[in-house]
Amino acid sequence: MGKYFGTDGVRGVANSELTPELAFKVGRFGGYVLTKDKERPKVLIGRDTRISGHMLEGALVAGLLSIGAEVMRLGVISTPGVAYLTKAMDAEAGVMISASHNPVQDNGIKFFGGDGFKLSDEQELEIERLMDQPEDHLPRPVGADLGMVNDYFEGGQKYLQFLKQSADEDFTGIHVALDCAHGATSSLATHLFADLDADVSTMGTSPNGLNINDGVGSTHPEALAEFVKEKGADVGMAFDGDGDRLIAVDEKGNIVDGDQIMYICAKYLKSEGRLTDNTVVSTVMSNLGFYKALEAEGIKSVQTAVGDRYVVEAMKKGGFTLGGEQSGHLIFLDYNTTGDGLLSAIMLMNTIKMTGKPLSELAAEMQKFPQLLLNVKVTDKHKVTENEKVKAVIEEVEKEMNGDGRILVRPSGTEPLVRVMAEAKTKELCEKYVGRIADVVKAEMGAE
């Protein structure tokens, strides 16, 4: 990670860390790096529903116009919507203003290249290098050479049309409950499933600028679980603030995570001959039960570091079509270039419709190992991998496990946290192991 760019773009507390001044520079220098070979390059900008979105959008637009870019504002739209439209509309770049599942005070800026993919480490480092130069030597067009800004709010409809074409058939007879986290999918999801003839019930669809991800969405699926039972729905779909994640709920109110959705879709795609090389790409956070279930179906797996960008890199390198994370970032590379909650929901609905099985039955085919994840607030998250006492306690626990579980300790990519994860035969063992390691992490580098 660089000085400004983390694992998913530039993030921080809006107007404190991520200021309009910084957003202007990110727009100016980021836009230049992505479009320097083009005359009057086209750049798309979308945002989620956070109160700070307008402020940061204005600053970003100013930065882009200052290098002569033609800016098209998409308004409130999901991150994968921006990625899809950037490629579909032959734009030179796309920008999304969002902090995804983070609380409302945070915001972020992430870029997409003209191919719809997130930036490489090299591109991000080049942007940072230019931002940190003592003087700004970028071109400064004047008069008619300055960029212009236009609104293209019809972009959402173009994206919805693409999603509808991804459905194998309509969803007549399926009652779906949607939780849109008061975020970017609040309007999109409702229209999508209604247009596909599903019976739709909604929650988390009343954004007011302040309530995004507040007790709702994919990071709080228990709210949707209650809603599904209350409405008697067949399936529930929970998205996060920017719509790049999906967590599902079955008809009994049980939560179905990204690993389970990936497994269900992988099995279905394999049966249809649409799973390239019968391989799925996942991260080190995926459950042991996920790998065992794939193996039983004759499906291979490739593991990457945590972060959907690393999953996508491995998918592109190997030519694979399905990958994702337990957190609900699922990538169907035949369809879109990044994690897409709405597309993932369509793919899961395809499987439910075509197999005729309820989600509870499909999910039960994968037996999850008990897993516990604890976040420890620390002063310097990057030192955890070098700390000798932390390494020693991890070795002790792994020796005790004797192959019947695993431990993962890693710094968060976006927050000042160390994540301690354990999988074991029982929940009690998970609690014991995680507590033991977390105590050492806290003692060595814990923050107040």
Curated annotation (Swiss-Prot):
Transmembrane segments: none annotated. Mg(2+) binds at residues 100, 240, 242, 244. The active site is at residue 100. Its EC number is 5.4.2.10. Its cofactor is Mg(2+). It is an enzyme of class 5 (isomerase). Keywords: Isomerase, Magnesium, Metal-binding, Phosphoprotein. NCBIfam families: glmM (TIGR01455), PRK10887.1 (NF008139). This is Phosphoglucosamine mutase. It comes from Bacillus licheniformis (strain ATCC 14580 / DSM 13 / JCM 2505 / CCUG 7422 / NBRC 12200 / NCIMB 9375 / NCTC 10341 / NRRL NRS-1264 / Gibson 46). The gene is glmM.
